[in-house]
Amino acid sequence: MPNIKSAIKRVEIAKVRTIKNAAAKSTLRTTIRRFEESLSTDAETAKLALNKATRALDKASSKGLVHKNTAARKKSRLTKRYAKQFAQVG
């Protein structure tokens, strides 16, 4: 446990940020999971869920919650899954 006042404050700030980041990551994972579940429904619902997931990944990336390359990779994979599921035949 730190003795210096500023160090004590930094520990408290770190705790608060850890909780916030955990909540934000949980929300991000939930959004992605909802998209994956929506793939079994119609294309319109899945498209809306894909847009929400993409937006959530962009926000998380801009806030430093996930690395920009990680966000780009996940968006790419989600988009590929959507395209494969609802590909136009013929």
Curated annotation (Swiss-Prot):
The keyword Ribosomal protein applies. One of its GO terms (biological process) is translation. Keywords: Ribonucleoprotein, Ribosomal protein, RNA-binding, rRNA-binding. One of its GO terms (molecular function) is small ribosomal subunit rRNA binding. It comes from the Bacteria. One of its GO terms (cellular component) is cytosol. It holds the Pfam family Ribosomal_S20p. The keyword RNA-binding applies. Belongs to the bacterial ribosomal protein bS20 family. Binds directly to 16S ribosomal RNA. This is Small ribosomal subunit protein bS20. It comes from Desulfitobacterium hafniense (strain Y51).
